[in-house]
Amino acid sequence: LTMDRQMLTKIISGILKNAIENTPDEGMIQMEAETLGDNIQITIRDYGVGITETNRELIFGGFFHTQDTDMYSSKRPYQFNAGGAGADLLRIKVFSERMDFSVRFETTRCPYIPTDTDMCPGRISDCKFIQNREGCLTTGGSTFYLDFPQV
């Protein structure tokens, strides 16, 4: 993989930041890199709330918020439900178009909070719908795939 280190850091940290801000406390995020044919694939999987069907086509559009900004609980970066300007995923999409790599995602919205106005309590142990951590880890989340050509 030949790419400017700062750019690669911005790409990965942008997806990680979104994963952290959408995964309740006591949750889990996984990241792995592997060679797949002629590509290097970086996968970032969060076990968070997932993205609603309505928002799936909009998240790379730029300055898009998945909920009303008044509903953000902390407004502090890297905390659950912090919210943001919606610039990270736009930046990653622009980088992908200019630097010849692909970005895609799969997501499952937590069935207990199906709309953007339904709120996750922010801590798995505070959720009234599940019995334990594993119950949360199997209900929702998103996986982002970054595919970089090897040179």
Predicted features by range, described:
Residues 8-9:
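A residue-level detector for a conserved hydrophobic packing site
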Residues 18-20:
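Short helix-loop "hinge" at the ATP-lid/N-box region of the Bergerat-fold HATPase_c
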Residues 26-38:
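Short beta-strand/loop element within the Bergerat-fold HATPase_c
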Residues 72-94:
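Glycine-rich phosphate-binding loop
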Residues 46:
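Acidic ATP/Mg2+-coordinating residue in the GHKL
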Residues 91-104:
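Conserved glycine-/histidine-rich ATP-lid loop and adjacent helix of the Bergerat-fold HATPase_c
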Residues 3:
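Conserved micro-motifs of the catalytic ATP-binding
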Residues 51-76:
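Short conserved segment of the HATPase_c
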